[in-house]
A protein has these predicted regions:
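Sec-dependent signal peptide recognition
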Residues: 2-9
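Bacterial extracytoplasmic/cell-wall-associated proteins, especially those involved in peptidoglycan
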Residues: 21-139
Length: 139
């Protein structure tokens, strides 16, 4: 519990420094990665991963989202096109609220996840924390 409190405090600091553009990129990441998921906590869980990585790697939330090969939704590199697509998604405002709300702890501190139909090489070296919808989370 103590670790979660430390991460929460640091994550709140990350959130308080979000510019409008950073907020849009993080919100778009939630939509593009989990907007089609209707499992409770799916978008919050992706948000947790972003914040946990930002804290752990000392990066901005936007830098975490746009890191090469980290979130498959951005792999094409067509940021403007993908951002416009995400903004048209019916759950855009829901995702925006998540981005500007206090972090949750659905994933138990996860900083990695993958879809349940994949078997990435790195999964066996991490501790599985939870499955939410079609995503499996690890730390």
């Amino acid at each position: 519990m103590k670790t979660f409190r430390i991460i929460l405090i640091t994550a709140l600091a990350v959130l308080s420094n979000l510019s409008a553009n950073q907020s849009e990129i993080v919100t778009a990441t939630l939509i593009l990665e989990a907007g089609g998921e209707h499992a409770e906590g799916a978008m919050q869980a992706v948000h947790e991963v972003i914040l946990n990585r930002a804290v752990k790697r000392r990066l901005t939330a936007k830098q975490v989202c746009l890191q090469r090969k980290q979130f498959s939704c951005w792999n094409s590199g067509k940021i403007a096109t993908l951002l416009a697509k995400a903004k048209r998604h019916p759950r855009w405002h829901e995702a925006l609220v998540i981005v500007h709300s206090a972090p949750t702890n659905y994933t138990g501190g996860a900083d990695h996840y993958h879809a349940d139909y994949c078997d990435p090489y790195w999964a066996s070296s991490l501790q599985k924390t939870r499955k939410i919808g079609r995503h499996i989370f690890y730390k």
